[in-house]
UniProtKB/Swiss-Prot annotation:
GO cellular component: mitochondrial matrix; mitochondrion
Any Pfam family the entry gives: Sdh5
Compartments in which it is found: Mitochondrion matrix
Origin species: Drosophila willistoni
Family indicated by similarity: Belongs to the SDHAF2 family.
Primary localization class, coarse: mitochondrion
Extent of the transit peptide: 1-12
Keywords, sorted A to Z: Chaperone, Mitochondrion, Transit peptide
GO BP: mitochondrial electron transport, succinate to ubiquinone; mitochondrial respiratory chain complex II assembly; protein-FAD linkage; tricarboxylic acid cycle
Quaternary assembly: Interacts with the flavoprotein subunit within the SDH catalytic dimer.
Protein name stated in the entry: Succinate dehydrogenase assembly factor 2-B, mitochondrial
InterPro entries, alphabetized: SDH, SDH_sf, SDHAF2
Membrane spanning stretches: none
Amino acid sequence: MLRQILSSAVAKSTRGLSFTVNRLASNLDKSEYTTPGEIIDYDDPTHLPVPEYPLRPDEPLETRKQRLLYQSRKRGMLENDLLLSTFVAKYLRDFNADQTAQYDKLINGVSNDWDIFYWATETKATPAEYDNEIMQMLKQHVKNEERVQRIRQPDL
């Protein structure tokens, strides 16, 4: 008898709960919260001053390459850490002074690392200012046609 009373009480309470949840879910406009295939990327606010990266015209080439190696590994964003550190490990030692300057401008001239990621993965168009030989090499590197596993940064 007690078992029948409890089972009927549970059935009545869950029916009401189920009705309430279904009613709430049906009122929810799901398109407001999902963006299939769309990137959520807001413009940087104009009221936040972004300091310009200081130019280092007298920096020796080897010192510049060492600095760029470090900066490529410490982006603060895992995606770029992996992409840029593997790119630098493969190409930086063979860069001439002009290519090194282009790479320096790319990783230090852009204020938002997501921009570098979107350009390299060709999710967004690269601005003409950064669309150079180094960016083309980076885009080719990101395609990973050799199917190299890039789950960690290369050893120093």
